[in-house]
């Protein structure tokens, strides 16, 4: 959710002020996400106890980092962005975008690599068994002669089609 807030704040501030962030400021602001740790998360939880709202706590944490009141603050000229944090965004807007980003990241970093590994193993296996003759079955009854490699390759081809669809999926968010 911090990533959504940072990205949105950079975008809305640029639109409303007519000025983009310098590369240095952009990098500093992005470092809020890159350096976010369990220790930082605990600070957000402490803020949440006082404001009784998880996203308000995250907004306050982000603002404190930009204003320089946080020991690891990127500060500099970034305090001018504090009025734009969460401007016009509700909790569901942020959560919706955050979940879409998490789904996309898990697809790219976990699921697709695992599926590709399985596909690679099946391709090698089908190739190895391409000359292993076997009797195919239809409705449980012996039918044509085929090869074990071909019988592995057919569902593998279907799997590859599904992987292409999965790769091209877009994740929708409320905004």
Task: Map each language-model feature to its residues.
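A helix-coil-helix interface module used to build multimeric assemblies
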Residues: 1-175
């Amino acid at each position: 959710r911090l990533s959504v807030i940072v990205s949105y704040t950079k975008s809305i501030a640029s639109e409303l002020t007519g000025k983009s962030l310098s590369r240095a400021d952009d990098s500093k602001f992005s470092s809020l996400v890159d350096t976010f740790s369990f220790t930082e998360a605990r600070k957000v939880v402490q803020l949440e106890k006082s404001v009784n709202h998880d996203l308000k706590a995250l907004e306050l944490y982000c603002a404190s980092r930009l204003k320089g009141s946080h020991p690891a603050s990127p500060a500099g000229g970034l305090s001018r962005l504090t009025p734009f944090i969460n401007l016009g965004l509700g909790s569901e807007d942020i959560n919706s975008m955050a979940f879409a980003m998490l789904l996309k990241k898990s697809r790219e970093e976990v699921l697709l690599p695992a599926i590709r590994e399985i596909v690679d193993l099946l391709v090698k296996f089908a190739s190895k068994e391409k000359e292993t003759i076997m009797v195919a079955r239809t409705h449980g009854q012996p039918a044509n002669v085929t090869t074990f490699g071909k019988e592995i390759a057919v569902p593998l081809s279907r799997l590859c089609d599904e992987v292409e669809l999965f790769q091209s999926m877009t994740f929708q968010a409320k905004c």
